[in-house]
Amino acid sequence: MILVDSSVWIDYFRGSATKQTQRLDLLLDTEALAIGDLILTEILQGFVIDREFDEARRLFASLKLVALGGEDVAIEAARNFRKLRKLGITVRQTIDTVIATRCMVSGYELLHDDRDFDSFEKHLGLR
């Protein structure tokens, strides 16, 4: 299962051709994809035009919806944040710590274009 971060979805809906959006285009037809509940909120709230909002909702309805949080993930996310901080790395957004931790706990790969996740890949085993 591959969870797709908002950093990729935003570029995708803007029509930006990046390595990640090109991969997403291929994966939409061939792989089981997931979206986190808070990522869904973040993406949908950005649409101004109702038609585009509805089109995005239909696309997201075909994906697995993953609850990102919960007590176990929250505690493990705090541990992961602290591990990185001890290495001199500060993650800019708490939500990124939660997303990365959910992926690691659930064995998901994360498709992203956000440097905050690079430290999770390098030091904590995020795929």
Regions found by a protein language model. Give the residues of each.
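Conserved beta-strand segments of alpha/beta enzyme cores
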Residues: A32, K64, G125-R127
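Short, hinge-like loop/turn segments at secondary-structure boundaries
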Residues: D50-D54, L84, R127
